[in-house]
Swiss-Prot record:
Protein's name according to its UniProt entry: Methionyl-tRNA formyltransferase
Catalytic activities: L-methionyl-tRNA(fMet) + (6R)-10-formyltetrahydrofolate = N-formyl-L-methionyl-tRNA(fMet) + (6S)-5,6,7,8-tetrahydrofolate + H(+)
Function: Attaches a formyl group to the free amino group of methionyl-tRNA(fMet). The formyl group appears to play a dual role in the initiator identity of N-formylmethionyl-tRNA by promoting its recognition by IF2 and preventing the misappropriation of this tRNA by the elongation apparatus.
Single GO cellular component term: cytosol
Enzyme class: transferase
Sequence positions that bind (6S)-5,6,7,8-tetrahydrofolate: 113-116
Tagged with keyword Protein biosynthesis: yes
PANTHER family named among the record's database cross-references: METHIONYL-TRNA FORMYLTRANSFERASE (PTHR11138), METHIONYL-TRNA FORMYLTRANSFERASE, MITOCHONDRIAL (PTHR11138:SF5)
UniProt family annotation: Belongs to the Fmt family.
Organism: Klebsiella pneumoniae subsp. pneumoniae (strain ATCC 700721 / MGH 78578)
The EC number(s) this enzyme carries: 2.1.2.9
Keyword presence, Transferase: yes
């Protein structure tokens, strides 16, 4: 068993809560938890705590919710806990240099990619969209840059042809805690071997936008099929029909020449609505009109066949 460490945990969403849960079941002592302030959510816009806050309070841990760690008073909250290390997982706030240097072993971060590939806010979605064959998690020593610190530990997993960002998120949420506990053991025992990132291999995973999720029919069918999986469950790929946004949950590639302008419906069957793209045909198999639940192409054709007349050009 490795030496027990005094840990500050900083994180916000469910992905982070799964890492906190692993720490709470370990030999280490979580001395305080930092998470984002409660946010309005739902139709009533009621203030809701983060998943990390809910878990921390269930274990009677001290919870801190500053909107920034730049003020010295907020930095003092970190210093006063006397931690050996700070573990950061999808926290959402920038840690100033002073905070990074406060714990004896500094601050480490669990990142959802195999660095230096996909530094940034949306590594899971970008790796899927790019057609990567594998991804994973990297535990790194944090510095003042964006995901630029030395790498301490990596675990990888394959990306399958069926993966969505939702399924990949779940895979990495299983790998992350394993890698985190292994890294903490190495740091506690003095056996960690930091590895500098190769700057020649860097690529960036910019934050996603809803407008970016609008289907661009000039892309190839293969690119669009990956995009649909990458943007599921958020922000969801979408197209516009009759002035209404329609989300696309699932599609497949038909490797045939379309012989039509990109965006043209070439066939509408119960198996899927076939649309010409920049290269090949994309078959839309599960769609969700505004205000409705997701449904099969067959069910949508039964109610809205006029939307999908072959020869119609989608925006």
């Amino acid at each position: 068993m490795s030496q027990s460490l005094r840990i500050i945990f900083a994180g916000t969403p469910d992905f982070a809560a799964r890492h906190l849960d692993a720490l709470l079941s370990s030999e280490h002592q979580v001395v305080g938890v930092f998470t984002q302030p409660d946010r309005p959510a739902g139709r009533g816009k009621k203030l809701m705590p983060s998943p990390v806050k809910v878990l921390a309070e269930a274990h009677n841990l001290p919870v801190f919710q500053p909107s920034s760690l730049r003020p010295q008073d907020n930095q003092r909250l970190v210093a006063d806990l006397g931690a050996d290390i700070m573990v950061v997982v999808a926290y959402g706030l920038i840690l100033p240099k002073a905070v990074l240097e406060m714990p004896r072993l500094g601050c480490i971060n669990v990142h959802g990619s195999l660095l230096p590939r996909w530094r940034g806010a949306a590594p899971i979605q970008r790796s899927l969209w790019a057609g990567d064959s594998e991804t994973g998690v990297t535990i790194m020593q944090m510095d003042v840059g964006l995901d630029t610190g030395d790498m301490l530990y990596k675990l990888s997993c394959p990306i399958t042809a069926e993966d969505t960002s939702g399924s990949l998120y779940d895979k990495l949420a299983e790998l992350g805690p394993q890698g985190l506990l292994a890294t903490l053991a190495q740091l506690a025992n003095g056996t960690a071997r930091p590895e500098v990132q190769d700057e020649s291999l860097v690529c960036h995973a910019e934050k996603l936008s809803k407008e970016e999720a609008r289907i661009d029919w000039s892309l190839s069918a293969a690119q669009l099929e990956r995009c649909i999986r990458a943007f599921n469950p958020w922000p969801m790929s979408w197209l516009e029909i009759d002035g209404q946004p329609v989300k696309v949950w699932r599609a497949s590639v038909i490797a045939e020449a379309a012989h039509a302008e990109p965006g043209t419906i070439v066939a509408a069957t119960k198996q899927g609505i076939q649309v010409a793209t920049g290269d090949g045909i994309l078959s839309l198999e599960s769609l969700q009109p505004a205000g409705k639940k997701a449904m099969s192409a067959q069910d949508l054709l039964n109610s809205r066949r006029e939307w999908f007349i072959p020869g119609t050009r989608l925006a």
